[in-house]
């Protein structure tokens, strides 16, 4: 694995982020996971801080996520997620995100996943801990609504968007879309 905590077991299958790719072991053999975002992840991975990489499972959606630091960051600031439940070898489902979580506790321990994030610029709101340097962690309840609620109770909508690479819509896949004459269909 890319780090001591870069592997995780889900339903008898081990998944891990290696130094050059993603893999799984199903009890019989090791399989390389086809990944369309692999270059995006590895070209900006801070290998000097790879001990920060850790894997997490979200059984609510059938996902394994690896949280990792990018080049120029000593702390986790990005994630890559593999959907093991809906992926098939010909169509693996991967997503990338700036979701930065330094710890993760899956549902099962509690009703929903809980996680923490670390910020070097935040100031703790609890009594001073002797010997601690700057920075603070935030404790998050995941998968609860569509708004972010801070410790002070302030609520804001979670910023979200979807970005995709090019793909073809073939004749049998265009339900709900009507093309008339020569045309080009772009979604942005």
Predicted feature locations:
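Beta-sheet repeat architectures centered on beta-propellers
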Residues: 2-13, 19-188
């Amino acid at each position: 694995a890319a780090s001591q905590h870069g592997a995780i077991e889900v339903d008898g299958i081990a998944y891990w982020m290696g130094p050059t790719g993603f893999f799984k072991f199903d009890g019989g053999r090791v399989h390389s996971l086809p990944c369309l975002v692999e270059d995006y992840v590895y070209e900006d991975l801070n290998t000097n801080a790879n001990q920060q990489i850790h894997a997490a499972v979200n059984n609510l959606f059938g996902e394994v996520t690896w949280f990792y630091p990018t080049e120029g960051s000593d702390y986790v600031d990005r994630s890559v997620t593999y959907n093991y439940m809906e992926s098939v070898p010909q169509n693996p489902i991967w997503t990338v995100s700036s979701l930065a979580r330094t710890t993760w506790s899956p549902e099962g321990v509690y009703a929903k996943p809980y996680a923490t994030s670390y910020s070097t610029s935040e100031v703790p709101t609890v009594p001073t801990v002797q010997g601690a340097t700057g920075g603070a962690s935030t404790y998050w309840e995941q998968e609860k609504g569509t708004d972010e609620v801070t410790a002070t109770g302030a609520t804001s909508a979670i910023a979200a968007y979807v970005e995709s690479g090019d793909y073809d819509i073939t004749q049998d896949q265009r339900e709900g879309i009507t093309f008339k004459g020569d045309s080009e269909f772009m979604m942005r």
